[in-house]
Amino acid sequence: MKFMHLADLHLGKRLNDFSFLEDQVRLLCQVEEIARSERADAVLIAGDVYQKASPQSEAMAAFDQFITRLKEMGLAVFVISGNHDSAQRISYFSSLLKNSGVYVSEAFDGHLQQVTLQDEHGELVVSLLPFLKPIQVRRFYPDEKIETYQDAVQAVLRHSSVDTAKRNVLVCHQFITGAETSDSEEKTVGGLDNIDAAVFSDFDYVALGHIHKPQKCTRDTLRYAGSLMKYSFSEVNQKKSVAVVEMGEKGETQVHTVPLAPPHDMRLVEGMLDEVMAMPYSEDYVWVTLRDELPPPDARVTVSTVFPNMMKFSVVNSKTKTDIDVLAREAMENKSPEELFSDFYRLQNNDCPPGPRHMEILRSLRKELEGEIR
């Protein structure tokens, strides 16, 4: 059986007042062509179908048309909700849809939703696990200690019947410890959403969503498909793709990726004004940084004639750097040791603030040092 794995469509997303929907629709057409050329049997969509829990009608129509075309091609489709989606809205008509071979995760009811497919190698079980928080799982297992995201997922899997003699695929939208993130993903405080990859050892392939960079985690068959396109300038160096997974007999799983070609790339442009103006005209989404010491007042307008889809514009020179240094120094002088420590901790820990325990240790050390000085 061959299936395609994609995730994090974020249909309807906007950035700096630019709508991505037209690009997203064209990329979904590319996915259809890849499915056709690869002769895929199914498509797995691992969450964050929409950018918002209440998506705009145009985004919903785009997804409806995409799913309809996949079904016209004879593919089975599996969809779960992500942290950006409303599990209730995603699962509308799920009972009716499954009769057509479209399997949509329902709002979590304490059980792992499973679908059994059949091919020449026997049964293949696809399990659907929508994005979960500990509080959602705790109510179904009141006798268990469920504090972290890992506790929650482990509890669900422990109470589910996963027959390891069969081929098992899990579609999941969570954060795996060690995965490389970008600015466009939501983060929790202190890394509480981390889940160890070993939790999924019973599954032959784990189709992950949530992280926007395509990547494998500990093994080739535990993989983030990545987002449909670049959604922040922290992703400019990423190559977006679709994962194509072919499962033979138990233990025989092959994975390769097929690149996606966005109608407009997202990239950084930097240089002196005359250098930037000498660049070829481009409708890519760009962040332009000028290095001129005295750029003309209308530099932004001038640059937009070469880059009409310029999303951000900035000037970095000796003056702006000096201004930044002065402001930073003044800000530091007006901050308490606790605030300075918090800033440093955030810098070292992906913008996560220090917890109460860290602050208590800091205060204890301060008292100890102040006592020695006296």
Enumerate the language-model features and the residues they cover.
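Conserved catalytic scaffold of divalent metal-dependent phosphoesterases
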Residues: 92-191
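Active-site neighborhood of divalent metal-dependent phosphoester/pyrophosphate hydrolases
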Residues: 40-58, 75-88, 168, 174-191
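Conserved beta-sheet core of the metallophosphoesterase superfamily
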Residues: 99, 182-253
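Accessory, non-catalytic peripheral segments of nucleic-acid enzymes
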Residues: 37, 42, 246-374
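N-terminal active-site segment of His-dependent metallophosphoesterases
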Residues: 1-68, 356-368, 372-373
